[in-house]
Amino acid sequence: MHSIRRHPLLEFNSNGIYCAQADVYIDPWRKVDRALITHAHADHARYGMKHYLTTSGSALIMRERIGQSLSIETTKYGQKHTIGGVTFSFHPAGHVLGSAMIRVEHKGEVWVASGDYKIGHDSFGNHFEPIPCHTFITESTFGLPVFLSLIHI
């Protein structure tokens, strides 16, 4: 049996989705030292981070879109990175080339931050991979009540 966590593994603050234990952000919207990037679209990957960690597909796009001189470390899907005792891994999100959901594990607790994802298949080949977790942080383009009429489309 796991002990109850007093603080969330991931939390939102003025810079983005923050993992205090590892001192890293996922898709931060303000300048930070370490950023884990789910994919290269402008609302997720921004200029100004000291160091980025993302997939090689996202890194290619980020360098073209943001700048060749970015400090980017690339990772493969499923490869584990341990920072401050927290294990991070990137898993296919099916959204665009290089897109990933980020799995975060600490002391047996697993959280997943989705970024954008698509469960349908296409020619990119990085098809959505369901990840068992305790907490799932997701985005929703059409999640507001004003979009209820789209449910039957």
In which residue ranges do the predicted regions lie?
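His/Asp/Glu-rich metal-coordinating catalytic cores
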Residues: 2-11, 16-19, 25-29, 34, ...
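Conserved G/P- and acidic residue-centered "switch" motifs that form tight phosphate/ATP-binding loops
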Residues: 39
